[in-house]
Regions:
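Short, well-ordered secondary-structure micro-motifs within conserved domains or adaptor modules
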Residues: 2-10
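Histidine-centered active-site loop/cap adjacent to the catalytic His
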Residues: 97-122
C-alpha cells in the first residue's frame, strides 16, 4: 500500500488499474487526460486493445470509463500553464493544465507536488 500515488499522463489503462487508482484516497493527477481510455492487455500476444474511449465503440463515448472527474477538456491543451492550479476531487488533486514544460522550468512546482501528496500546507 502506498501513502500517495502520482499519476502522469496515464491515458490508456485497464479496468483493474482504473479501479485501483480511483479507489486510492490520495492521488495527484498531474496531467489532464489521465484514465481516459479503457484497454485490455494480452501479455502472451504482446498486444494492447482499445476497449472503450476516444469515440469507440460509439461516437458519443469520449472517456472510456465515463469518469466523473475526467478533466481532459478544457485542460489537456493548455501547455503554457500560465495559471496552473491544483484543485481537489474526491480522492485527491488535479491540475488545470498540461505541465510538461512547467516542470522543466519551475523548481517550486516540485515543492508544491511534495506538499500536496504529504498533506503539508507550508
Amino acid at each position: 500500500e502506498f501513502d500517495a500515488v502520482i499519476m502522469l499522463h496515464n491515458e490508456y489503462v485497464t479496468r483493474t488499474i482504473f479501479d485501483a487508482v480511483t479507489d486510492h484516497p490520495n492521488v495527484l493527477y498531474l496531467y489532464p487526460n489521465a484514465l481516459y481510455a479503457e484497454i485490455e492487455v494480452n501479455y502472451a500476444d504482446e498486444t494492447i486493445t482499445l476497449i472503450r474511449g476516444h469515440n469507440y465503440p460509439e461516437p458519443e463515448i469520449t472517456n472510456g470509463f465515463d469518469w466523473e472527474f475526467d478533466n481532459t477538456r478544457p485542460y489537456e491543451y493548455d501547455t503554457m500553464c500560465l495559471d496552473m492550479q491544483f484543485y481537489e476531487i474526491k480522492n485527491g488533486w488535479m491540475t488545470t493544465c498540461y505541465p510538461e514544460l512547467k516542470m522543466k522550468e519551475s523548481a517550486t512546482l516540485l515543492t508544491e507536488i511534495k506538499n500536496i501528496v504529504t498533506g503539508n500546507d507550508s
